[in-house]
């Protein structure tokens, strides 16, 4: 139906006859001439219709051109010629196609929005097929496509095996709710959609495949936000006979190559490395954005003897923290803006936010200054590096909570005070805690997942020091986003059983849920490790968008709905009966 793509028509084709197909982007009838911007996936070319006096065929052609509306689907035949008025904004701007024939392949109904408009998100998602025609959406989807293609080429060239793992599998706890699928042939039993291929890829290492990868679809029934969807895609990788640096060095080289190929970005020749403890101490986050130079400063030792009980209580608590965040130029903040920062911190658990504001002339404005002697106050300001024109925020309380809300303030301040440097800041975060304590459940939970190896090989040591145990987990962070997470795995069945026990998973429960894994580990499992990268998140970063929904062809809303297909939707009673499911009225 076509000989060339619209966006690729250029001067080399001048004088030649071409056949094009695409959508009417714009049609302009200027009376004596019609201009049609014809669009396909490669771009736009101008089609010109010039009626010739006394020529019935050209008059009919002009009539067809004048009748065109937005998004009508056309086939156009014509001769390429040089444009009199060059359009430098178009790749095809030096040429035009003089139409000799126009066939309307399909008329478009009146549009809810035009391809060059940017309507509200609900409208975009309801008419996703129209939204995806927009040039910006085409660009972002193509970025994702190029990313996946580049990853496959890179890994295939290095002897990785692309192996599929099951979509219908066993329900195993991995931190989020499973999506459950009734098993029609086994009444009362259910499959689960995989939250990740974690256990299968470990078993593939036991099976001797050595290097595995998969562009894997994963499913988690959890609350949605801009960087989270119910179903998502990850690059899943696993290596046999490796230590942490083997995995990290390989994927670091891979990311440098991929970013260069896909978006022509040169990532750092060597990614910085930071332990989890250092990241939390300096930045209040396990995925710090290193483009923001602001750092948290611990001040517990300087406020232990103050008369401010909020500070003294936290400073004298072994699990407490008093941290300061200096914002250069922050003295310009009004009281209302300071209250806004306090409200932002409250979202992350802060019960209050103390501050010291120093005017350009050195005047102090602070609700906590009265709790300090003159020398102690001066020492505090010196310790945090505060000067005229600055504001210093303080957080006090439990270590983790203070780190969280002060880290959130750091990000907010960095953006609002234009302190985010240009460029790309990759980072390895290592040495994560093995466990964290769940006050509600009164037990340990795995910080990464239950299959991450501890840094110690001795089970007795792990049991005795579970509270402070460090794992062999690692995350790759880019511009404040965790783009990949991995670890060295447990490959000994006795260690895996001990970790289950520390997580409150007894032998009987472990056998019921993970018996297949424990059995596999018993038959000569090699030391192994791996990592998984979020394709959606990396594509969003490459495309320069805040929301992963922009790089997913058919995403869900934050309300977990597909507005285009109207999913989820009720199921007929006979279908439910086939899978032995009965809907009960919601209890009020």
UniProtKB/Swiss-Prot annotation:
Which keywords label this protein? Aminoacyl-tRNA synthetase, ATP-binding, Cytoplasm, Ligase, Nucleotide-binding, Protein biosynthesis
Primary enzyme class: ligase
* Cellular component aspect of the GO annotation: cytoplasm
Location in the cell reads: Cytoplasm
The name this protein goes by in its record = Aspartate--tRNA ligase
What job does this protein perform?
Catalyzes the attachment of L-aspartate to tRNA(Asp) in a two-step reaction: L-aspartate is first activated by ATP to form Asp-AMP and then transferred to the acceptor end of tRNA(Asp).
Q: Which gene encodes it?
A: aspS
What family name appears in the similarity comment?
A: Belongs to the class-II aminoacyl-tRNA synthetase family. Type 1 subfamily.
The GO annotation for biological process reads: aspartyl-tRNA aminoacylation
Query: What InterPro entries does this protein map onto?
Result: Aa-tRNA-synt_II, aa-tRNA-synth_II, aa-tRNA-synth_II/BPL/LPL, Asp-tRNA-ligase_1, Asp-tRNA-ligase_1_N, Asp/Asn-tRNA-synth_IIb, AspRS_core, GAD-like_sf
Q: Does the keyword Ligase apply?
A: yes
Family matches, as Gene3D superfamilies? Bira Bifunctional Protein, Domain 2, GAD-like domain, Nucleic acid-binding proteins
What's the catalysed reaction? tRNA(Asp) + L-aspartate + ATP = L-aspartyl-tRNA(Asp) + AMP + diphosphate
UniProt binding sites for L-aspartate: 174, 220, 448, 489
Q: How does it assemble?
A: Homodimer.
The molecular function GO annotations come to: aspartate-tRNA ligase activity; ATP binding; nucleic acid binding
Q: What is its main location?
A: cytoplasm
